[in-house]
Amino acid sequence: MSAGDARISAFDHGFLYGMGLFETFRTYGGRPYLLERHLRRLAEGCRELRIRYEPDAERLEALIRRTAEANGLPGDAYVRLTVSAGDGGLGLPAGDYEEPQELVMVKPLPAAAPGLYERGRELRLLRTPRNTPELATRLKSLHYMNCIAAKRELADTDAAPGAEGLMLTADGRLAEGIVSNLFFVADGEVRTPSLDTGILPGITRERVLELAQAAGHPVREGRWSWEALLEADEVWTTNSVQELVPVTTLAGLDGEPAHPRAGRAAGPVVRELLAQYREDAGSRPSADT
């Protein structure tokens, strides 16, 4: 259906209380990459929220394909799958949500800035801290105020167009970007903040860790300061739509510039892993095994 024909109840608890989850990913040649992993994370989150929803990969892949074709996007596209708790009336529930709403949206991939994957982009340190997850593991939930506040803070700075913002934990440790996970190379290791910092367990983050290990790079998850990032040999961010984006400019709270040792071009490790990621995305069947 067209966007104008879509309807959600005013009593849907996704609307009233933010009870819902979503997954964002992309297609390569019409095939959703790592779909099974996205659906697994979605199903686990629904169980945490007591939303009765078990995704069917085959049915959803067909639905994504039809929606993409209806939008004239049979090849590469941006996909968002949302599951909302459904109609629950006014008041907080005590039981399970039995009739969730499912929504698939497809749009063109956002255009990347010229030279983005060769020359990289700016990563700006923000004052907005990454909030503490409401449950043991951060869910990709409809509660997005923290990220919106961070996005607005970034927009109010003099950061370069296309820059990403970096949030720290409440105790000042590296967390994640507004819409991305963070990686860096130091002392010969590929490093990324650990999940106990409260970051989202990103699907692309998970795959990049696997690719790095398979390529023979030592990997480590941990807790590091902003100063550790300033000493890094390479820095990049990951998400399912933008893939791996090199960071070649680091800027502090008031815009003071600092540069990773890799300078103003993508470093060798991120170039290698991006090539492997794209090869994997292009050759892998849509149902990840």
What spans do the regions from the language model cover?
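Catalytic subdomain that performs nucleotidyl-dependent activation
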Residues: 197, 208
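Feature captures the catalytic cores and cofactor-binding loops of soluble hydro-lyases/lyases
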Residues: 202-207
